[in-house]
């Protein structure tokens, strides 16, 4: 819709004004291999999109988003739209013809396709088409049976495709019906994902900007050093480095070899 497009442009303008212009160490990553050009103390910032409502069926708008530097697109939030059904849509349909066309454009542009909010049918449809696929903020459904999490079958297929899962820190997606969700509960997800062959496919997606409840000790991004410190009690330094950044760098290197 026009309203969604206007809001998208407003958010991009805020990103440019508040993130890039006011923080000299922040550099926009407009293609994935720009990460390798960052200098010491510089931080890369990436524009991503959740929900295709902003461009609808207008591929001119989609092209503009690519030109602005959007490098990851999730077709839906939890609801359905012109591209796909989200995980909250009860009918559980998959990608539309339009959604498939958008993914093909993502492939051409080396833009990631994000499956975190898709219905299960949309997930499987996406895996058939997308060259660069990941779940930006999801967990393991076997450990926490929330619809937003991925089943063992989905995770194995994602890894087989070369895709990644970035863990989400929203307590309800980590441990359902638990008043005090801890880092130990997140470790349960990491252990399980590793047992499925995901050691080289795990990252952290957090979702700090989208949640108002928190894992104890992970209330904001400033707690990442503490989180890493805690993970080192469970895993080797090499494995923790993989989870924190090495896996993702390897992933994007496969997008831009």
Where is each model-derived feature located?
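Extended, charged catalytic domains and RNA/DNA-binding interfaces, predominantly
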Residues: 1-168, 172-174, 187, 191-194, ...
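Short acidic/histidine-rich active-site segments
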Residues: 168, 197-218
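Outer-membrane beta-barrel pore domains
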Residues: 177-180, 211-218, 231-234
């Amino acid at each position: 819709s026009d309203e969604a497009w206007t809001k998208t442009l407003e958010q991009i303008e805020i990103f440019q004004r508040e993130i890039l212009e006011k923080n000299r160490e922040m550099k926009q990553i407009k293609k994935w291999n720009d990460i390798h050009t960052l200098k010491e103390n510089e931080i890369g910032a990436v524009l991503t999109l959740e929900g295709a409502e902003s461009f609808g069926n207008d591929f001119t708008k989609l092209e503009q988003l690519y030109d602005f530097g959007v490098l990851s697109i999730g077709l839906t939030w939890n609801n359905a739209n012109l591209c796909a059904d989200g995980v909250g849509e009860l009918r559980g349909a998959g990608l539309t013809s339009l959604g498939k066309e958008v993914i093909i454009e993502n492939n051409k542009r080396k833009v990631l396709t994000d499956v975190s909010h898709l219905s299960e049918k949309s997930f499987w449809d996406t895996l058939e088409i997308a060259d660069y696929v990941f779940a930006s903020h999801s967990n393991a459904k076997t450990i926490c049976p929330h619809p937003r999490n991925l089943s063992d079958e989905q995770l194995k297929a994602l890894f087989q495709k070369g895709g990644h899962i970035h863990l989400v820190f929203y307590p309800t997606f980590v441990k359902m019906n638990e008043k005090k969700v801890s880092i130990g509960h997140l470790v349960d997800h990491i252990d399980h994902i590793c047992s499925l062959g995901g050691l080289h496919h795990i990252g952290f997606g957090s979702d700090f900007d989208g949640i108002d409840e928190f894992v104890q000790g992970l209330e904001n991004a400033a707690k990442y050093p503490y989180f890493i410190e805690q993970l080192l009690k469970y895993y080797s330094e090499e494995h923790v480095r993989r989870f924190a950044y090495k896996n993702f760098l390897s992933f994007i290197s496969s997008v831009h070899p």
